[in-house]
Amino acid sequence: MNPPKCNDEDYINFLIATPRQVSATEAARVQPEREEAPAHDAFTRLLQRLEPDAETVWHEAQTQVSLAHGILVLDDSTLDKPYAKKMELVTRHWSGKHHAVVRGINLITLLWTEGDRHVPCDYRVFDKAQDHLTKNDHFQHMLNTAQGRGFQPACVVFDGWYAGLDNLRLIRSFQWLWLTRLKSNRKVNPDRQGLRPLSAVELSEQGRVVWLEGYGLIRVFKIVATDGDIEYWATNKVEMSVLERVKWANFAWAIEHYHRGVKQFCLIERAQVRSKRAWRNHIACCLRAFLRLESHCYHHGISWFEAKTAIIRAAVRAYLAQPLYTLNPTA
């Protein structure tokens, strides 16, 4: 059997460099001229040959993190696939981008950050029909893995979707702090006068210590937006100050930046494949491409946009020196 003509590094570098088009055909077209250059079939086989494994992402991410500093942020994002009728892994999920339930592939990521870093350390692809695991199962598996790897985060921040009692108790068992948003109907006891929904309790932006049903003492901050929307932020650190809550909440926005970055600059939504194995391998390679892009930008003090633009700048300069497309008379 002939050896493979391309490997995962070839595909990762293609993802970093290509501006929009992600296909095996395009990957083959842009290969440097050489003997035995990989054809499009080589990249198609690559995405079927690799073993999808989140451990590979961690192997590269661990060089970018500090286990004893920073925070862990967990959230999911939907890779839009509104017209994919026969693509595997596509199910219906809530999209924060569209503010509606849409068709797509759901990616759950555990991100490490110190505010200015964006390092995906672990991830899961939602496929309940195959593995029978819910998003909360993935949440717990990734945090158990993070604890086993030696993480000691200053805080774990996550969306209210994951604020169930089992998840809160798991984080407490690690002796970690958590910060999340609770729904207004969560039952608390603020004054030993019985359980009431959060919406019926007198709360303020300064926070108040209450007893969460089934859990114990927590501190809840009531945040009222300028448009009247109300959020109830909660933490198991009952002495947490307003400034500390704001600090960790701002740090947690890094995962939203990561979601946009991995879609816009690593093109995680754009693979022209159908099978779940190919999609899993494409997603893993995109996260590894993002790690390289993020590391380069952090050490050189530039944005992801600038780094991506710099790749094609030389090609634009060469074209301007010798334009190929001219106006040819037809009359």
For every predicted segment, state its role.
Residues 17, 33, 96-100, 129-132:
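Short gly/ser-rich anion-binding loops that grip negatively charged ligand groups
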Residues 44-115:
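Active-site-proximal, Lys/Arg-enriched surface segment
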Residues 1-4, 8, 13, 83-85, ...:
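Single, function-defining residue in the core of a domain
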